[in-house]
Amino acid sequence: MSLTEARFHDLVDSTQQALEDIFDDSGLDVDLENSAGVLTVKFESGQQLIFSRQEPLRQLWLAARSGGVHFDYDEESGKWQCDKSEELLSEMLARLVSEYTGADLDFDEI
């Protein structure tokens, strides 16, 4: 069953809020900006992670230095999963943040 528009927006909103909370609590020197449904995380190194919603496809998109990645929400697991590699958003973020900062953050709650 595909996500309804309302459910999709609720999921993206709660995911973005959880991400903000994780970064706020991390002690990392990051700037967070959430505007018009787009969350931008700017690291001290100049690297950025940009999270946006693609409503027609019901996907969460992540733009990073390595390129763009599209995530579908898997209702069974309750996780965002890459539509190409099937890597979980939580796993990809842990890897990218480690590459950018050397920090080991836990994104399992998303």
Swiss-Prot record:
Keywords: Iron, Metal-binding
InterPro entries per record: CyaY (IPR047584), Frataxin/CyaY (IPR002908), Frataxin/CyaY_sf (IPR036524), Frataxin_CS (IPR020895)
Alphabetized GO MF terms: ferric iron binding; ferrous iron binding
Biological function: Involved in iron-sulfur (Fe-S) cluster assembly. May act as a regulator of Fe-S biogenesis.
Keyword Transmembrane helix belongs to the record: no
Record's GO cellular component terms: cytosol
Homology family: Belongs to the frataxin family.
GO terms, biological process: iron-sulfur cluster assembly
Protein name: Iron-sulfur cluster assembly protein CyaY
